[in-house]
Amino acid sequence: MIRFLSVSLFSITFILSKEVSIKSIELSGPITDRKQEISGMDWYNDNLFFLPENQGGFLFMITKSEIQNNLQKDDQKPIVARQTKFSTPDYSKLIPGFDGFEAICFSNENVYISIESEHNDIMSGHIAWGTIDKKTFEITIPPKNIKKVKTPTQISNMSFESILMHDDHALMLYEANGANLQRGAYHILFSPKDQNTSRIRSVNIEYRITDATRVDENGKFWTINYFWPGDKKALEPSRDLIFENTPKGDSHQSSNIVERLIEFEIKNKRIIFTKSEPIQLVLNEDSPRNWESIVRFDNKGFLIATDKHPRMILSFVPFN
């Protein structure tokens, strides 16, 4: 009996500690230039849009069918990402300390963008909103469609890295929510109807939340939870309760880097963890990957993308 119990516990630990290998999707064209610094992506119908951090007057787009064909073929040809027009005000003149775009979200033909700024050592978030043309895919954001949003705490170069829709509100997720940074963590809900903001309480989670999927019909969504050891001083990590409950995978056991996906749900007007196990990615120890974007890929898994560290990477993460 004791021997059986030991074997069972070992098997459970092994299952919970399993890491997922990702599959790269090769792209070509200007999107691969590290200077673009892809910071967000979202689906509009069957088109995947990529948001560069730097203001250049365009986004990038590839289609779902192109991704499917790439993943199904052994002889993969790089997907050429097309540029689509992104008409906005010159935010470098409109927003003091404008630092770039952080996230994008579509809701029918409505588009929401998260913007980061740092002025006089004060971090601020902004939300801007506009529309997309169904035929040309041009996105237009009028100068008046912008609202400044106060961050929950002050950490240099950190603001709202994710936008997702929930009950006709744009939910802006702040990226640093550790127990040593916020006693009562919260995120921001923006109402497009009256442009008012409100708070939604949340559990604490260590490290950074760098992007999130859309909310599903059950109020659940997945996020990228990333830690680069160079951020230790800024993030002041507390106990990692997730790794205390779910053992580290092989590559995570020998590294201080964390690359994983965590599922949350919105329940009783609060953001909490679900019972889903974290998805740990097999690490590339030589090159930590700053995953900045995530979307669901049907019921098959996720697509995730880096900004420029170590380079622009688009990858598929299978569910199993």
Placement of each model-derived feature along the sequence:
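Sec-dependent signal peptide recognition
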Residues: 2-8
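Hydrophobic h-region of N-terminal signal peptides that target proteins for export
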Residues: 8-17
